[in-house]
């Protein structure tokens, strides 16, 4: 009787399990392991066979016998199958809710963050536009600053030029006063020293006499440009010079030439005293030789100039000399005497009259600095110059200030000339 009741209960349980399994088979969640498959069948007149097929293809068979053999073991296996089915059913029912809850939570989070992201994107776009606008404004400001810098540099250059003119003008007044007060006796002495030479000088050279300068060479019958030996009155040993026999009637003794930058003119005192270079090219004759020439008689100066566009100009000075009023010209610095300008280049030398010669190693100018060192040349600097024909050979326009081969009245302080030639000739009595 007991076995019959248990058999009935087992059949009912098997039917319940089978129904649950069928429900799971129709409604299991995609992506999860399918639940066990349970089937029942007759195993005899009074027996039932319950089969559970698991997801891993293993089978569990339970034989229910009314004669109750191994009843405890069969019930244990049936309870195990029931537990597996209930667990699968529970997972099946819980999984959709879990997924749904996660999806809803994710959607809520996205819905909450999306406005913030959109707001931040709008802020970034606004900041980007502001940065672009600021970049454009900065570029305009930079261009304005660069333009202003260029204007200030130009104004500074112009102001330096005006200041140089002003200083030179004041210096001229002071020098004129000093000359009027104290140079009467030296001038008279120098005139007396030159008087014999001036009075004894013939218009031509007698046969066998030695030429004192290029005018004597010309008057002796030589009419070709070139190198000749001359023997000044106070320099009997003589020296060679280059004679220009063509310009304005010829007879010019050349003492300075710049033409190609092949010779370094940024030199010291000894070089400028003794001379350097090649007479047929760039050269400086030497202060002691220029002094020996110009103390013989009254000389005039002619300066030829050329720029890099083949433009030419000249400056003529009716009176020129070096160390005219000096007992010891080297000790005095070979001071310059120049006057009576005419020509097409404009005057850039009169303001240097009365000044001693300055080199990078011997400063005799009126500036706090050494003008020769500052402007890379050697000249009769005042404070500092209106001409600098012994400056650097910079080949035309340059960005530096007044340190080239300059003649400011013609090309300003930032243009280095292509050619310059300084030459002297005695003032002829028939002129």
From Swiss-Prot:
It comes from the Eukaryota. One of its GO terms (molecular function) is chitin binding. Residues 205-428 form the Fibrinogen C-terminal domain. Residues 1-3 are cytoplasmic. Its main location: membrane. It is found in: Membrane. SMART domains: FBG (SM00186). Residues 25-431 are extracellular. Disulfide bonds join 214-243, 371-384. It is a single-pass type II membrane protein. NCBIfam families: GGGWT_bact. This is Fibrinogen C domain-containing protein 1.
């Amino acid at each position: 009787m007991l076995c019959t009741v248990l058999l009935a209960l087992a059949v009912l349980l098997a039917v319940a399990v089978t129904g649950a399994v069928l429900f799971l088979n129709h409604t299991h969640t995609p992506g999860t392991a399918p639940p066990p498959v349970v089937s029942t069948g007759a195993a005899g007149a009074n027996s039932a066979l319950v089969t559970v097929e698991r997801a891993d293809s293993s089978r569990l068979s339970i034989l229910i016998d009314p004669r109750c053999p191994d009843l405890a073991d069969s019930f244990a296996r049936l309870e195990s199958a029931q537990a597996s089915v209930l667990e699968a059913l529970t997972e099946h029912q819980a999984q959709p809710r879990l997924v749904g809850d996660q999806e809803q939570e994710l959607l809520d989070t996205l819905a909450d963050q999306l406005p913030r992201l959109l707001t931040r994107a709008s802020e970034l776009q606004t900041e980007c536009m502001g940065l672009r606008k600021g970049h454009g404004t900065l570029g305009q400001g930079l261009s304005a600053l660069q333009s202003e810098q260029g204007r200030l540099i130009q104004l500074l250059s112009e102001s330096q030029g005006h200041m140089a003119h002003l200083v030179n003008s004041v210096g001229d007044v002071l020098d004129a006063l000093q000359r009027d007060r104290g140079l009467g006796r030296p001038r008279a002495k120098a005139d007396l020293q030159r008087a014999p030479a001036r009075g004894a000088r013939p218009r031509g050279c007698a046969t066998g006499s030695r030429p004192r300068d290029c005018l004597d060479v010309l008057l002796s019958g030589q009419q070709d440009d070139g190198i000749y030996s001359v023997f000044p009155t106070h320099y009997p040993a003589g020296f060679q010079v280059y004679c220009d026999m063509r310009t304005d009637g010829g007879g010019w003794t050349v003492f300075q030439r710049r033409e190609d930058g092949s010779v370094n003119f940024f030199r010291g005192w000894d070089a400028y005293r003794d001379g350097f270079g090649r007479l047929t090219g760039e050269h400086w004759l030497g202060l002691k030789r220029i002094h020996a020439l110009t103390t013989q008689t009254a000389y005039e100066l002619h300066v030829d100039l050329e720029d890099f566009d083949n433009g030419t100009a000249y400056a003529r000075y009716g009176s020129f000399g070096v160390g005219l009023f000096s007992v010891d010209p080297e000790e005095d610095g070979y001071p310059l005497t120049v006057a009576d300008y005419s020509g097409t280049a404009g005057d850039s030398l009169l303001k240097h009259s009365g000044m001693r010669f300055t080199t990078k190693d011997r400063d005799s100018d009126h500036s706090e600095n050494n003008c020769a060192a500052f402007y890379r040349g050697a000249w009769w600097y005042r404070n500092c110059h209106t001409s600098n024909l012994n400056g650097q050979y910079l080949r035309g326009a340059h960005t530096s200030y007044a340190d080239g081969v300059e003649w400011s009245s013609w090309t300003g302080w930032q243009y280095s000339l292509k050619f310059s030639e300084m030459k002297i000739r005695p003032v002829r009595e028939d002129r």
